[in-house]
């Protein structure tokens, strides 16, 4: 990984703050997308430290973690293999599991062999995808979601906690980007963006149960990520084709959503995870490949300014 120390923060978007509702994000046809999912992902270790994963434009894979809960970060370390898009989640026993698709769409995963411990080798899953997301269901089993190059949507889950996987099942609809998160009551919620930038979501009607149909959000995005606030409200994050950054949240846990609010700055990739104390942290990559993050300064609260990481990841 080329290491570049960046000291400037992203340019502020004039007149837009954390609490201001703005017009729904629109597509500006400014930047061509890669056709693959996010180049950046985050998950939380058993000991509460966040871990960040990313791939660069050469498909090399890197990760780094907080040195202490909510604290400073380690340096980047390389992982073997080559991936184009990535996702990560924590198993019920605290072991992180890391997923990715390579440039041919083949799907791989590896996992910590003990909580906060060493990593297994790569194992291939059948099928081909271009975008991938993962969440943990109410039973503690990971569920994997993805879209392929034709926009077809699939999912599969662990048969037992930390165990082998079911076969793929197809979900109706067509998406190019996917994100998933678990509601406070254990119901999974799936978010996605289609090739026109339209934004959709659907959710389990009961924990571990059947799914609703697709519901469309206003606005247009090219990337999407999700995390859960300390008070149980899901929050989604995304960027549009002009690299503007937006977010919105459930008004109350499991209820309808706020309007979109715009963050300052410009990103082309996003990922989000919740710190051990309940504060969401947002990670992103801009059009030059530079990596940034910001975090809630208190649970359910306002956001810090952007801070830069060293290194370059795929825009």
Residue ranges and their predicted role:
Residues 24-315:
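A structural motif
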Residues 1-23:
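Secretory targeting and sorting signals
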